[in-house]
């Protein structure tokens, strides 16, 4: 009897795992790099706003909120890209394409994730709550941009970085110039690294009529990315000067330069797999800059 109960429990667990696995993949739970690329800039902001380790509840709210909103963003992105994903090699096995998740359930999942995230934000101050409404608008409208403009990567940077002004608002009750400088740096960074991502799908996107910075920049893609990364680093220099950060921050920026240079080495021939590696490598850039900020604000 005990053995039968054990096997029944295992069978039930496997059943639910198989049922929930497509939803986990739809939310990109199996690909944490996207979450980390959102997390690092938000943590930059939290540590700078608090001039050190932020309040534990604020840190928990923003960290959990980042995971929830990133997952929701992936869900709504796949929902709006149903016309495109079946024709792109990298995305043709996504749950909404294969039918393992229905469009209706995807919308329900998006709404649930955003409601939970909003519930967390309601524990913050009024300014943070108001800013979160703008963040919701950005998250919902981003997926449609690739149909109408070659600059969805720029808009992604605007959406991805919205946690920065929210973090300052939550801790300081205002959004100072320092926050907007950091926000601009993140827009430049996101545009640059998401162009690597767009270069992976460039040929398929051209066939389907989708738009991206990779298509817009064409043969000048590496040059423009170099300019974007340079502007990002210069803006981060302004952040360091305005916040009067110590030498550890500047060491982290020098390290970031080396890491970014490595991306151009591995993706210099524009091969899709190499471009994807360059995109993934930006996690180390974000983490390095965070380490510099965290050490520089330690008292």
Swiss-Prot record:
<feature type="transmembrane region" description="Helical">
    <location>
        <begin position="56"/>
        <end position="76"/>
    </location>
</feature>
<dbReference type="InterPro" id="IPR006370">
    <property type="entry name" value="HB_polyprenyltransferase-like"/>
</dbReference>
<dbReference type="GO" id="GO:0006744">
    <property type="term" value="P:ubiquinone biosynthetic process"/>
</dbReference>
<keyword id="KW-0812">Transmembrane</keyword>
<comment type="pathway">
    <text>Cofactor biosynthesis; ubiquinone biosynthesis.</text>
</comment>
<keyword id="KW-0460">Magnesium</keyword>
<keyword id="KW-1003">Cell membrane</keyword>
<dbReference type="GO" id="GO:0008412">
    <property type="term" value="F:4-hydroxybenzoate polyprenyltransferase activity"/>
</dbReference>
<dbReference type="InterPro" id="IPR039653">
    <property type="entry name" value="Prenyltransferase"/>
</dbReference>
<feature type="transmembrane region" description="Helical">
    <location>
        <begin position="214"/>
        <end position="234"/>
    </location>
</feature>
<protein>
    <recommendedName>
        <fullName>4-hydroxybenzoate octaprenyltransferase</fullName>
        <ecNumber>2.5.1.39</ecNumber>
    </recommendedName>
</protein>
<feature type="transmembrane region" description="Helical">
    <location>
        <begin position="278"/>
        <end position="298"/>
    </location>
</feature>
<dbReference type="InterPro" id="IPR030470">
    <property type="entry name" value="UbiA_prenylTrfase_CS"/>
</dbReference>
<feature type="transmembrane region" description="Helical">
    <location>
        <begin position="33"/>
        <end position="53"/>
    </location>
</feature>
<feature type="transmembrane region" description="Helical">
    <location>
        <begin position="247"/>
        <end position="267"/>
    </location>
</feature>
<keyword id="KW-0997">Cell inner membrane</keyword>
<comment type="similarity">
    <text>Belongs to the UbiA prenyltransferase family.</text>
</comment>
<keyword id="KW-0831">Ubiquinone biosynthesis</keyword>
<feature type="transmembrane region" description="Helical">
    <location>
        <begin position="151"/>
        <end position="171"/>
    </location>
</feature>
<keyword id="KW-0472">Membrane</keyword>
<comment type="function">
    <text>Catalyzes the prenylation of para-hydroxybenzoate (PHB) with an all-trans polyprenyl group. Mediates the second step in the final reaction sequence of ubiquinone-8 (UQ-8) biosynthesis, which is the condensation of the polyisoprenoid side chain with PHB, generating the first membrane-bound Q intermediate 3-octaprenyl-4-hydroxybenzoate.</text>
</comment>
<feature type="transmembrane region" description="Helical">
    <location>
        <begin position="180"/>
        <end position="200"/>
    </location>
</feature>
<keyword id="KW-0808">Transferase</keyword>
<dbReference type="Pfam" id="PF01040">
    <property type="entry name" value="UbiA"/>
</dbReference>
<keyword id="KW-1133">Transmembrane helix</keyword>
<dbReference type="GO" id="GO:0005886">
    <property type="term" value="C:plasma membrane"/>
</dbReference>
<feature type="transmembrane region" description="Helical">
    <location>
        <begin position="105"/>
        <end position="125"/>
    </location>
</feature>
<dbReference type="InterPro" id="IPR000537">
    <property type="entry name" value="UbiA_prenyltransferase"/>
</dbReference>
<dbReference type="InterPro" id="IPR044878">
    <property type="entry name" value="UbiA_sf"/>
</dbReference>
């Amino acid at each position: 009897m005990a053995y039968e109960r054990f096997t029944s429990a295992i069978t039930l667990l496997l059943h639910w795992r198989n049922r929930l696995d497509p939803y986990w993949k739809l939310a990109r739970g199996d690909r944490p790099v996207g979450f980390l690329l959102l997390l690092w800039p938000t943590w930059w902001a939290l540590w700078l706003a608090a001039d050190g380790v932020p309040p534990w509840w604020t840190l928990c709210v923003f960290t959990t909120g980042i995971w929830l909103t990133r997952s929701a963003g992936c869900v709504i992105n796949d929902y709006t890209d149903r016309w495109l994903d079946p024709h792109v090699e990298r995305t043709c096995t996504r749950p909404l394409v294969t039918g393992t998740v229905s469009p209706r359930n995807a919308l329900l999942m998006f709404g649930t994730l955003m409601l939970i995230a909003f519930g967390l934000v309601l524990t913050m101050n009024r300014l943070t709550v108001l800013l979160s409404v703008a963040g919701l608008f950005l998250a919902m409208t981003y997926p449609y941009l690739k149909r109408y403009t070659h600059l969805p990567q720029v808009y992604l940077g605007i959406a991805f970085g919205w946690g920065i002004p929210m973090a300052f608002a939550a801790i300081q009750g205002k959004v100072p110039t320092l926050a907007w400088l950091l926000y601009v740096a993140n827009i430049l960074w996101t545009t640059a690294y998401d162009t690597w991502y767009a270069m992976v799908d460039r040929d398929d996107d051209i066939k389907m009529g989708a738009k991206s910075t990779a298509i817009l920049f064409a043969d000048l893609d590496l040059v423009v990315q170099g300019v974007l990364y340079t502007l990002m680093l210069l803006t981060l220099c302004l952040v360091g000067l305005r916040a009067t950060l110590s030498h550890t921050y500047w060491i982290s920026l020098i390290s970031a330069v080396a890491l970014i240079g490595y991306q151009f080495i591995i993706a210099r021939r524009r091969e899709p797999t190499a471009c994807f590696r360059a995109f993934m490598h930006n996690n180390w850039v974000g983490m390095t800059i965070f380490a510099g900020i965290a050490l520089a604000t330690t008292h």
